[in-house]
Regions:
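Short coil/turn segments at beta-strand junctions that form active-site/ligand-binding loops
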Residues: 5-7, 190-193, 213
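Switch II (G3) loop of P-loop NTPases
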Residues: 194-201
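Hydrophobic anchor at the beta1->P-loop junction of P-loop NTPases
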Residues: 9-11, 196
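Residue-level signature of catalytic and energy-coupling elements of molecular machines
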Residues: 145, 196, 245
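Small-molecule kinase domains that catalyze NTP-dependent phosphoryl transfer to phosphate-bearing small molecules
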Residues: 3, 12-17, 24, 94, ...
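A conserved segment at the C-terminal end of the G1
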Residues: 21-33, 40
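ATP-dependent small-molecule kinase phosphotransfer cores
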Residues: 41-191
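Extreme N-terminus of proteins, especially the signal/transit-peptide cleavage junction
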Residues: 1-6, 51-52
């Protein structure tokens, strides 16, 4: 498709809002299968896995998911399955979340915190009376992704950890010689075309825009999401999306909105913040 001005398109939205679907639509609309093949047929035949589109899909969570697959002994295909992702892990993965002061700690499930084992935590604090309680956490693959990605990765190792490991692979495909009036001018760097459909935090938006990309928001009406983990709500009040797509109808209607964005929408709004 001609007229695409950006090499890098980020997509934000709650889970099940349609982020991946929009990413697949962008791939479809920039592939040789459009318009000769219908979009649903394109998905059914798994054509998005063929490197035919000018855009490829990358995720900030790709390498995080690889780590979780190693920990759980599962495949990426399993981890991408919605039912598998929400299924409780075996009991050996359960733990107690113990609240002390303004912090919380994870405690072995087999050592119930309301027994003498809790004294271990109390003895480590000058104010043991600040124990605020506990709750049983039955880990799921999704929760494990959140804990490793945000609570551990972003909050302990580095806030930009997943941006850094993702863009370490964002390297020029080649260089193009640019001439002016037939005379050599300079070498132009040609970067790969990426769609990143799991933008969750302001620093991820910043990382994309820093590299000349744009970020769109996908909203889905009538779909209640009670997940309040920071990875799901950190961008709820963000005001600098470059484009907003409301997924409030069926797939053909959504495809038309994505088509409008690709053809015309990139001139509607541009925020650099």
């Amino acid at each position: 498709m001609e007229g695409i001005k950006y090499n890098l398109i980020g997509i934000s939205g709650h889970k099940n809002s349609g982020k991946d679907l929009v990413a697949n639509m962008i791939q479809y609309l920039t592939s040789s299968y459009y318009p000769k093949m219908e979009f649903l047929q394109y998905l059914k035949e798994n054509k998005q896995s063929v490197t035919d589109s000018s855009f490829c899909i990358k995720r900030f969570a790709d390498k995080l998911k690889d780590i979780v697959c190693i920990l759980l002994g599962c495949t990426r295909e399993q981890l991408e399955d919605r039912d598998f992702k929400e299924k409780e892990l075996p009991e050996e993965w359960w733990c107690w979340k113990v609240y002390l002061d303004t912090k919380y700690y994870y405690h072995d499930y087999e050592l119930a915190p309301f027994t003498g084992e809790l004294d271990v935590y109390k003895q480590l604090h000058e104010s043991p009376e600040n124990f605020f309680g506990h709750e049983l956490v039955k880990l799921t693959p999704r929760l494990l992704l959140q804990l490793l990605g945000t609570d551990c990765g972003r909050n302990i190792i580095h806030p930009n950890i997943w941006c850094n490991v993702t863009f370490a692979d964002y390297k020029p495909r080649h260089f193009r010689t640019v001439k002016y009036n037939g005379i050599f001018s300079h070498q132009e760097m040609i970067l790969p075309n990426w769609i990143i459909p799991d933008v969750r935090f302001p620093n991820e938006v910043k990382a994309i825009k820093k590299r000349g990309g744009i970020v769109i928001r996908v909203n889905r009406s009538g779909f209640e999401d009670n997940d309040i983990h920071p990875s799901e709500v950190a961008l709820d009040n963000y005001q600098y999306f470059d484009y907003i797509i409301n997924n409030d109808s069926d797939i053909p209607a959504l495809l038309e909105k994505v088509k409008e964005f690709l053809y015309d929408g990139q001139d509607i709004k541009s925020n650099s913040k």
